[in-house]
């Protein structure tokens, strides 16, 4: 069952900043009217801030829940002077020199004395600026960056693997995956698009002002960003990671051949782990799922670039023995420059006739599922941005022989149970057979990333009145199919600057 938050929990981050329930401070007499204190939540946390606000009010101090023109003293904990100034810039308060910016030690000293203490140098953060590392974004990076020029489409942005905002995008991807498990496509895409935007930024986000004017920054997204800036982590993402349903779905979908529907079915049956599924002999598993469980340990481990290169050599050599003019291209994350992945995708094409099942006779495939082509010539591209293509495909598990390695650190109890040391690894491989004239479109689609492909198709539809999929590009106004012999030609048809594969990690 989906977890329901109790109504007392404030759902929006802005209201959490809002910081305090007025009725808690009712009845306290204000003894020191000349001082108006604001306690920064950044790096302190909401619980501690609430406690300190209540304690100070009980001592007769006037403490504001929100930063306003009446505030005279700003108190911070574990923040340097430059960090406080950075934070103030994002609050649009104008001239910050009117504030006394003080360390938390000043407020605790005041409460111990029961009255305001003198503003000695030791309490002023400006005197302690060197004590803490500053998180300030270099001005040169921000000043040269114009948020309004950031496109809502990732196909108009360049996104390398150098992600300056991983702490935010990791949280977004956890949220998106949870919504995907719940089949809530709208919220899932909201977080994926936001993650895509932040991945393209050339600098780390350290304040809310940094995201002003950026596309795809809705309220839910901004709440998560603000909490991470202030607390260092997202409580919502942590809640998801600890959620029983999410953990089960995450584990179930790691099995080859298991999707959200099957995970939902197993979860409703009371199953929670892969081990529980394997132990339930009443379950009827598909051929693909049986293979997924049989080679589970290998398939859930990462595939290295070296392993991908080794598999690529096997596939190319095998294909070329019966199809000398074939073009075999590794696609997916490895084409975009990634060093690790979970499977390997290959695109295979040839100008001439072809035989598609030769790999099956080489003893290299532990499992394969061939999907025949369903493409109809002159078929209009699909309207759906996530539509499957119609190529002939082979979803396979390949046996990759590996040199023996020193397993001295390996769990000996497990090692002793093995009749012999395994000298191969099962690796997921997708082989996609495409007609030569559709190769450029297939290469663009199968290279990814998934979000880059989505945005490319959205851009074609909404900005160019065209329809794009992995087979073709159709101009609705001219009512013609646009031929392309390369990815560069497709970008040119769409009126886009060419984006290199390693710049498509949206």
Swiss-Prot record:
Can also utilize other divalent cations, such as Mn(2+) and Co(2+) (in vitro). Its EC number is 2.7.7.31. Gene3D superfamilies: 5' to 3' exonuclease, C-terminal subdomain, Beta Polymerase, domain 2, BRCT domain, DNA polymerase beta, N-terminal domain-like, DNA polymerase, thumb domain. Residues 27-124 form the BRCT domain. Mg(2+) binds at residues 343, 345, 430. GO terms for molecular function: DNA binding; DNA nucleotidylexotransferase activity; DNA-directed DNA polymerase activity; metal ion binding. It is found in: Nucleus. Transmembrane segments: none annotated. Residues 258-262 are annotated as: Involved in DNA binding. Its cofactor is Mg(2+). Its main location: nucleus. Belongs to the DNA polymerase type-X family. PANTHER family: DNA NUCLEOTIDYLEXOTRANSFERASE, DNA POLYMERASE TYPE-X FAMILY MEMBER. Template-independent DNA polymerase which catalyzes the random addition of deoxynucleoside 5'-triphosphate to the 3'-end of a DNA initiator. One of the in vivo functions of this enzyme is the addition of nucleotides at the junction (N region) of rearranged Ig heavy chain and T-cell receptor gene segments during the maturation of B- and T-cells. This is DNA nucleotidylexotransferase.
